[in-house]
Amino acid sequence: MNLTPREKDKLLIAMAAIVARKRLERGVKLNHPEAIALITDFVVEGARDGRPVAELMEAGAHVVTRAQVMQGIAEMIHDVQVEATFPDGTKLVTVHAPIR
């Protein structure tokens, strides 16, 4: 199987999001990369489903809560920017203050 670098990145993010979900199920607080992966995966999958950019920007800020991350992680993440593929092309989605 030959994957482009972009496809490899998407698979890595999807796998990291799976690991993060399993850790949340066990009650383990997420670290920085895990929180980013969950938010990114949510946006990418929402884009593939055809959800509008504005909706993903708003909903992406409710994927991970302060109670689900390690101390100080929420303050470290100011914005999450995701280049996602929508039915009408690739767009940049920015989730401001993604952990509330």
Curated annotation (Swiss-Prot):
The keyword Hydrolase applies. One of its GO terms (cellular component) is cytoplasm. GO terms for biological process: urea catabolic process. It is an enzyme of class 3 (hydrolase). It is found in: Cytoplasm. SUPFAM superfamilies: Urease, gamma-subunit. It catalyses: urea + 2 H2O + H(+) = hydrogencarbonate + 2 NH4(+). One of its GO terms (molecular function) is nickel cation binding. Its main location: cytoplasm. Keywords: Cytoplasm, Hydrolase. Coiled coil: none annotated. Pathway: Nitrogen metabolism; urea degradation; CO(2) and NH(3) from urea (urease route): step 1/1. Its EC number is 3.5.1.5. Belongs to the urease gamma subunit family. Heterotrimer of UreA (gamma), UreB (beta) and UreC (alpha) subunits. Three heterotrimers associate to form the active enzyme. HAMAP family: Urease_gamma. This is Urease subunit gamma. It comes from Mesorhizobium japonicum (strain LMG 29417 / CECT 9101 / MAFF 303099).
